[in-house]
């Protein structure tokens, strides 16, 4: 039951990232690379195959999804990406050797997607807005209000995801102590708190 809840939550969180050119593909690429590395560390070719195929697909897709995007994943593509990442993570977790801190390392790989989902839910709850209605209040929208460019938003979230994926992978590989997994989690929580201070439900500033 916990696995099902986790897969559904992560799938939906990644689907919500499709709000700006290149963001879902960038974050998904980084996350898939982390999962592929974790599966490869255990020498499990079968578990490494789904993230490997998704990684290749996302890299190719990103070439056409970078700003200005010529194609977009849409609901089907974003949900599929999230489902493959979530289910691959669940499979790697289930097959991980006991000495691996997989229970904390693997969820860290989805830090950016989960942070965005948390930001949206908290923001809409505080503003008494429908939780399931898109209101332009994601991380991408708030960064744009800070005048970060569209490609810049994808780069920022890619670096954020990269830091989380690197930490989670090193913890899984037993290079870092499991406590280090709290670093990206704590940092992401602080980022969410800071992003909540950026107005999301007012008209954006007019630029020339």
Q: What is the predicted function of each stretch?
A:
Residues 8-15:
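Active-site alpha-helical segments that house and flank conserved acidic catalytic motifs
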Residues 3, 7-8, 25-208:
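Alpha-helical transmembrane segments
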Residues 16-24:
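RNA/tRNA-interacting regions in translation and RNA-turnover enzymes
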């Amino acid at each position: 039951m916990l696995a099902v809840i986790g897969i559904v939550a992560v799938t939906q969180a990644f689907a919500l990232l499709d709000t700006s050119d290149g963001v879902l593909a960038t974050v998904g690429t980084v996350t898939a690379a982390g999962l592929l590395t974790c599966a490869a560390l255990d020498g499990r070719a079968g578990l490494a195959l789904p993230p490997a195929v998704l990684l290749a697909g996302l890299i190719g897709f990103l070439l056409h999804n970078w700003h200005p995007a010529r194609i977009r994943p849409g609901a089907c593509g974003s949900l599929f990406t999230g489902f493959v990442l979530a289910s691959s993570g669940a499979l790697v977790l289930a097959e991980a050797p006991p000495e691996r801190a997989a229970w904390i390392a693997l969820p860290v790989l989805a830090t950016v997607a989960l942070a965005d989902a948390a930001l949206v839910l908290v923001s809409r709850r505080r503003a008494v807005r429908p939780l399931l209605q898109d209101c332009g209040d994601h991380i991408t929208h708030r960064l744009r209000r800070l005048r970060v460019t569209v490609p810049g938003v994808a780069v920022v979230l890619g670096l954020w995801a990269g830091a989380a994926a690197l930490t989670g992978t090193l913890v899984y590989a037993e290079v870092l102590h499991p406590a280090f997994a709290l670093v990206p989690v704590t940092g992401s929580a602080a980022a969410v708190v800071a992003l909540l201070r950026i107005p999301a439900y007012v008209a954006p500033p007019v630029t020339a």
